């Protein structure tokens, strides 16, 4: 019996606000335990939540970016559960009236085709704290994360393979990153994924019993966990067993999914309206103000790069995979840089440098202005492409003007025949064997002579001019 896989994803995205959703405590990552807390986060008796308006702004922005309708009458609910990282014994979330609903995004599949994935809802809520279990036998609670604003984005069960789930997450991350509402760094917990998966015989309309997967710490782990789980469920059904509704965790070491607990239903959380927060009315003017702040998204930019700039689809995809890179590219174009030249540098030397130094493009000294200046120096023959690599490293480390660095470091390319001809004659005098080989008919010997010219000028000779002059001088010797 063959089965069809049904997948839906729940993605938690931490919103990049300065303060928390209901308290003035900072919402920054990486501080000492419990440094970013106050009496609201600790749930001291009598304290009340105060809504952070910026969180609603970001919620509206996310909903618009995901083609969602917006609940203009918005309220919060209590989700009741007891756990040490949740001092109130309930989480303030949204249940029946999320800020966004009925949305969709388009994903690109491996064969180049596209598919629309529907999004059921996007709701705002507060994050929980973090428990750490020490080697000393004690458990520790860090409430820095308690109250950090989240938006949970719940897809419909429209994905039919782990590969489609991977493509959905990639597209969703790009869109959220472009809005600027989150840095979507899975390694810091600002983007977390839970996956729901079931299988059913082909032709059956009813969904099978689903399992939820957790501990999916990268998109690749999502893909691998889903692939294992669809295989496990198929083996259970083929052997006559039944799938249980449960929560399982992905084991990165073994590639398997392991039982965590029997899955709770929403009734287990005893949702009811949050009495300490008012109902919020989101006016049309508010929505339109946020809409005006939306950037051009990756799909639009890719189309522009291919259709207007003549770049390949591959180059366009690489340039738009990061908003910072795409913004840098567009700023360089605004400075007058050649699109293909900037694209080549961003995907080549710049990408390699960022990877080696573990930095982002906004953390280094290279700017659209000094990169454009450097490319112009190459285009007008002031420096060679080889020297440009040295100039780039200097700019990345130190910033500043490419033109001033080239001048102060003595890197200006030698293009004057009056300077190059004596050097060529000196190379002839010091390389008699290569010269005689050339005279004897070995034309490849000229390559070593070019190399010697570049060595003698420490790479500053204009390769085209040097080659032309060399050919002319060699022709005189063989006439």
Swiss-Prot record:
Keywords: ATP-binding, Ligase, Nucleotide-binding, Protein biosynthesis. The keyword Acyltransferase does not apply. It catalyses: L-glutamyl-tRNA(Gln) + L-glutamine + ATP + H2O = L-glutaminyl-tRNA(Gln) + L-glutamate + ADP + phosphate + H(+); L-aspartyl-tRNA(Asn) + L-glutamine + ATP + H2O = L-asparaginyl-tRNA(Asn) + L-glutamate + ADP + phosphate + 2 H(+). It is an enzyme of class 6 (ligase). Coiled coil: none annotated. GO terms for biological process: glutaminyl-tRNAGln biosynthesis via transamidation; translation. One of its GO terms (molecular function) is ATP binding. Its EC number is 6.3.5.-. Pfam families: GatB_N, GatB_Yqey. Gene3D superfamilies: 1.10.10.410, GatB domain, N-terminal subdomain. PROSITE patterns: GATB. Heterotrimer of A, B and C subunits. Allows the formation of correctly charged Asn-tRNA(Asn) or Gln-tRNA(Gln) through the transamidation of misacylated Asp-tRNA(Asn) or Glu-tRNA(Gln) in organisms which lack either or both of asparaginyl-tRNA or glutaminyl-tRNA synthetases. The reaction takes place in the presence of glutamine and ATP through an activated phospho-Asp-tRNA(Asn) or phospho-Glu-tRNA(Gln). NCBIfam families: gatB, PRK05477.1-1, PRK05477.1-2, PRK05477.1-4. Belongs to the GatB/GatE family. GatB subfamily. This is Aspartyl/glutamyl-tRNA(Asn/Gln) amidotransferase subunit B. The gene is gatB.
